[in-house]
Amino acid sequence: MQNIYLCLTAFARGTYPDDAAIAGAFDELMSGDAPDAAIGGFLVGLAALGERPSDIAAGARALRSRMTRIEAPVGAIDTCGTGGDGKGAWNISTTAAIIAAGAGATVAKHGNRAASSKSGSSDVLAQLGVKLDCPPAAVERSLAEARVGFLFAPAHHAAVRHVGPARQALKVRTVFNLLGPLSNPAGVKRQLLGVYDRRWLVPIAEALRDLGCEHALVICGQDGMDELTTTTGSDIAELRDGDIREYSFHPEEAGLALVREADLQGGTPADNAAAIRALLDGQQGAFRDIAILNAGAALVLAGLATTIPEGTSLAAAAIDDGRAKAALMRMVAISNGEA
């Protein structure tokens, strides 16, 4: 555990360790040999100084090196965000993934159980009939045939269990709250990535650049939502071909009316699954609007739209002509082993 202790010594002095020590420490954390006290000390020490983009990228590399990988078509995207915004909203990024798949994108949707809401992506997809523990070959088939597959984080990231007890004991956010979206098992290079605090917009974009991402929209609603919101504007850090630019986007640019936060409140996994079914059957309202907005951004990343407003229109059409619902139904069938 040499690198962890080198890092702890540096943290105690109020200084950053060198990059090699940080990278080595992350490897040691996920090896299963580090004591919980050392893991906790490393995570708190890094958080106290502030996680830099290079630190975040190092953690993601360590996680990626141990994950169970799947193959995805070239150009596949992910809509997984950090979660943890405390808003308790509908499962927006999951719904956006389904809609984007219906519109022609290939979406390797990485996700987990609920972080701060009542319903995480895996919770609602299970309610919709998706089998979470299907083998990698079934996920790959789903990506090929349904254009959407669910990559259940615990099934692909077994090494994370080694830091679980220390994280639970700390009860504070650490770098691991940021690493999941950076560690897609399909190795996607295009991402719509919502963060729970706008201070992470540029650092996450820089970490993605370090990790070889081609095109990403790192987003945070000005209401604190880790999505493109429809209650107000959203802030975006866009990474494209190595360059990062910051700008804001307002839902009215896509022809969408502003709503109240209360209009976006989700419920239990069963509640949210029922809402997704209704949306895919054509129900209008605030949930549809925020879902097509985020799906529209995903379609920009997939190269199927040039602007978010254009993508939003394409997303709406995929609902209205039944393609989005068909994508979900095919994903459910494949995950359950049906021909």
Curated annotation (Swiss-Prot):
Mg(2+) 2 binds at D226, E227. Pathway: Amino-acid biosynthesis; L-tryptophan biosynthesis; L-tryptophan from chorismate: step 2/5. Its cofactor is Mg(2+). Binds 2 magnesium ions per monomer. Pfam families: Glycos_trans_3N, Glycos_transf_3. It comes from the Bacteria. Keywords: Amino-acid biosynthesis, Aromatic amino acid biosynthesis, Glycosyltransferase, Magnesium, Metal-binding, Transferase, Tryptophan biosynthesis. Homodimer. SUPFAM superfamilies: Nucleoside phosphorylase/phosphoribosyltransferase catalytic domain (SSF52418), Nucleoside phosphorylase/phosphoribosyltransferase N-terminal domain (SSF47648). The keyword Amino-acid biosynthesis applies. Anthranilate 2 binds at R167. The keyword Heme does not apply. 5-phospho-alpha-D-ribose 1-diphosphate binds at residues 81, 84-85, 91-94, 109-117, 121. This is Anthranilate phosphoribosyltransferase. Catalyzes the transfer of the phosphoribosyl group of 5-phosphorylribose-1-pyrophosphate (PRPP) to anthranilate to yield N-(5'-phosphoribosyl)-anthranilate (PRA). GO terms for molecular function: anthranilate phosphoribosyltransferase activity; magnesium ion binding. It catalyses: N-(5-phospho-beta-D-ribosyl)anthranilate + diphosphate = 5-phospho-alpha-D-ribose 1-diphosphate + anthranilate. GO terms for biological process: L-tryptophan biosynthetic process. It is an enzyme of class 2 (transferase). Mg(2+) 1 binds at S93, E227. Anthranilate 1 binds at G81, N112. It comes from Maricaulis maris (strain MCS10) (Caulobacter maris). Belongs to the anthranilate phosphoribosyltransferase family. Its EC number is 2.4.2.18.
